[in-house]
Amino acid sequence: MLAIAVTVSAVTAFAVSPTRRSFAIVTEPQTFKHCSAELEKYREAVCTDGLDAFICVNDWSCPDELRDSLKTYYRNRSLAGAVFVGDVPIAMIRKAQHLTSAFKMDEDGAFPMRESSVPSDRFYDDFDLKFDYVCRDTSETNFFYYNLAPESPQYISCDIYTGRIKPSVKRGDPYGEISRYLLKAAAAKSGRNPLDHLVSYSGSGSFSNSLAAWKDETITLKEQMPAAFSSSDGAKFYVFAMYPNMKDILLKEIARDELDLVLFHEHGVPERQYLTDIPEPEDIDGYYTDARYRLRRQLRTAAGRGQDTEALKAEYIKKYGIPSAWLEDWDDPKYEVEDSLYDAATGIMLDDVVKTAPNVRMAIFDACYNGDFREDDCIASRYVLSDGKALVGIGNSVNVLQDKSSSDLLGMLALGYSAGEWMQQVNILESHILGDPTFHFTAPEGAAKPDLYSTDINYWKKYTDAKYPCDIRGLALQKLFTLDAPGLSDLLMKTWKSSDEYMLRLQCMHLLAHYNDGNYSKLLKDGADDPYEFIRRKSTFYLGKVGEDWMADELAAVYMRDYNSLRVAANVGFVCAHFADSLFLKNFDRRLEEAAWVYDKDSFREKAMATFSLACSIESGTGKIFTDKNARGKNFYISGMRNNPYPQYAMPLLSLVKDNSESTALRTECAEVLGWFVRYHGRRELISAITDYLESGTSMPREVRDELVKTKGRLEYYTR
């Protein structure tokens, strides 16, 4: 261990006052050897900014060693956060997919461990989580695999915040990248920079391309960052269809010196941001060019899969009535180059970022895999490690839910809280800071900035007053939730009814889901007719997950009045089958019959059934596995209940868990799937039934018992 827990200057990091928090700059010997001067400059800047920073150098043998050190600093040195610089071990988490927003991949052999695990620094910043070590990767030896332990808390509540500064080795200058970044991060701490310029972009495919879903962000961001709305160029909102070439516009935007924050809502992979589809043709020549391009692309894809391209060409000629000349050049290298450029115009790639040298200080990537730091390089890292003034990238290490709120408590940034302090409140398993987690914008003079470390319930109740900004009130409600404040359910309901602030009311919705006292169901009924589309969308979705009988009629009413809001209508379709005996369809048919304003009822129903039919078909197939022991597709339907936890099948699913005639693998999977019933209206009874079974003395396989213990913990977190 080299210089662990000490600084490399004459100033010792052990002199930490009780009111002054510390910050660990964690690295390994090679990075320290090449970047020691820059690490020290960064440390000094962090100290000047208000934290007692220290450099921690070690040849880390495994993540547990580092985690134990961080725990010690947290107990003894008031550790606030840490940044991992260089080649610091990566914890690859398994058996914890419920802590992600969307990631679901078979962990039992169908996929490699590398792909079916989640790279996550929650291993380092949430000390209450418990893990069982699995193994070390034999080829990428900095990867260490862990299962979330059955006895662990089944939710995330970070004790500290973390970030990563991880360079690309393949680009040839990893230590230079680190050194240059540390110097610019240090320099940035000496200036004033309020958050008063932002850009938001929604890419093709985000929110089903629904303008009803897109438009409300102008309201929510104004609630959270009002200073950005005080000038003509302070807040800009783009959507993929605005201009023919959005890529050029966005590259110019992120290069603006005054830009503080950009939010990307898009699809992504580690090396690319998907911005748009191929632009719509504007004339006959454009349609001709576009058609040939698409056919060439399909043929190349088919060739890559080993398919018969000659047979496929003949099929296209017959199907579309086109001449063979349209297809003769599909494998011409000249057209391959041209087509690659055509495709490149639809996204931002790593090299585009390098050439642009972004100056936007913070970029939030509400996208899949843009923050996947297990790879040599990723979009979020490349933004901050390029030559511009970019300092922080917030990205996800795996895929992420499209219908996820990505701006909860985001107003904390405008009030001077650091990127790490904000993310500590909203982290999920896959979300990460790439860059300096201590970076913060300059707070407005006189801004309210409560002490995040207070555990005084009365202190936080004070900040629920309407005179405070919406995200300070939202933060206070979250702190009261963490402290298990008495009467919080009623306070959340009161705030929900009295506030007209979208983001504060959304926070009430998030937190009230954990109470099983009837208030949440009332909120969902109100929320299904809310002016904020996201609240309508999620209320619709959760009405099905709760699954009380009266909610079937409420969902039918939602569809009838809001079917033109594409994401709302889609969410009705997702959950319309979460009721027994086709209850939703019966209510829908009745409401349609009573709707005098619908001129052509047959056409209306036909279009609606296109939204409902798939869900109804899957539910029907699922039901058969409980009545027919030899039903086909049993594993498919059981696995599908992770996305579709049908309330009507909760107790039958537990019966399968108890059935000794079923295989251990199937019983274990059923036990795990029950953990997705966190909003089920009968979850208290479900918890009681699980507890009775666990305590009955009945013999059961260890795998089944472990999964039931985990499921019970998951359900209890939503049953205050």
Residue locations for each model-derived region?
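Structured catalytic cores of large enzymes
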Residues: 64-244, 253-261, 270, 276-283
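Caspase-like cysteine protease fold
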Residues: 406-494, 498-510
